[in-house]
Amino acid sequence: MRIDKTSSAFDSDLPSELLRNERSGIGSLLMLGYTPRWNASVPGDSNSAPVDVDVWKQYVDAVVRKYSAPPYNLRYFQIWNEAAGKLSGGLPQSAFWHGPNFSQDEKLSKPYERAMQDYVERIHIPAARIIRRYHAYVVYGGWPDQGGLDNFHRWLEYRSPVLKERMLDWVDYIDTHYLPVSDMETLYQQYVKNGPARGIWQTEIGNEYMKDPHYLPRYFFDFAVWALGRDWDDPNKYLSMIYHWDGYEPFRLTHPGPPERTYNVSGRSLIVLRQTAGGHLASFSKPLQCGPGVAASALLSGNDLVMQVSSSAGWQNIAIGGLQALRSRPIQADFIDAVSGEASPAGNVAVSWDNDLMNLRFKVPEHMNGADNNPPRHLAYLVVRRVTQGVT
């Protein structure tokens, strides 16, 4: 059984890529799938359940046994990808989970009535048992956004009448695709806050959403603010992964060249975010009083208070109370373009006080970095330096 190749064409050497990732400080997640055509319940369709489940289990065991051991030492394995039933977008069957009556012609395809039961009994629980046997963690197979959250709850809580077990009890990390941060709250409250799951991942975000240059920096900043208020006690408790980061479309993170790899707008925006909020993160509890036309959220990064600000053009204002301990100290505030990383001139940011209320005035340029958005907005970071001692 060959388990040493990867990529869409299976022409890349998997062991060497995993070792290269490790040397570069990059963690690796292996996705387990799909079905060999000769074992497919839908003839010739690798996105259907296996006829012989033992073949699937042999494959999973071979992969996890090899790659959870030295020198790879992988701890996370994702089972399948986007298995679901009927989708809200109108598809009667998921793109990666096919059953009887599937047709490449959407008009001829009919719903897969046993989609949930077959997935739980023939794919997920058999694989999850093997993964845990090797003391590794089970990552759910990326619930698609068009599958619907209510339906996802139903799948997670499904108890197999054959195996007498719930799928949820065989999931360590809830995993979804392309959801906004706000949609993670119900998953956290029901499955992570008090268990049984260890955390929430999104193994696909981005794609064409990245046509909006604000999408990635807003998503990751919102994600961090949200996670900091949700017992973020393990580095891998909350993760998001960008799909796909490399390509020739201008909204991908990088352009592969020739002559050399370069960063596109979305890639540069993440560099700016890392440079601006790259310190140890902590939550900031004091409310932000935003002026008209301004929306903002905040966190602490190292010694700095970092606010991500979305606003219209012109002079704008944010006030923050309860910071009287800072009044006796010199305050430096910077206004940084979230896409380019360019800092505004010193005269475009002003700090004043009204008792314990710190007022921050900043000038948003007429040429906004989200000029094509509706309505046009400018995304920036308002950073107050060396404030930690005054806000903790």
PLM ranges: what are they?
Residues 1-169, 177-179:
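Substrate-binding cleft and catalytic face of glycoside hydrolase catalytic domains
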Residues 75, 172, 240:
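Conserved acidic residues
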Residues 79, 140, 176, 202-205, ...:
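Conserved beta-strand positions
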Residues 144-147, 189-223, 227, 244-258:
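Active-site clefts of carbohydrate-active enzymes
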Residues 174, 181-183, 209:
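Acidic/histidine-rich catalytic cores of soluble enzymes
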Residues 304-392:
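C-terminal beta-sandwich/jelly-roll accessory domains of carbohydrate-active enzymes
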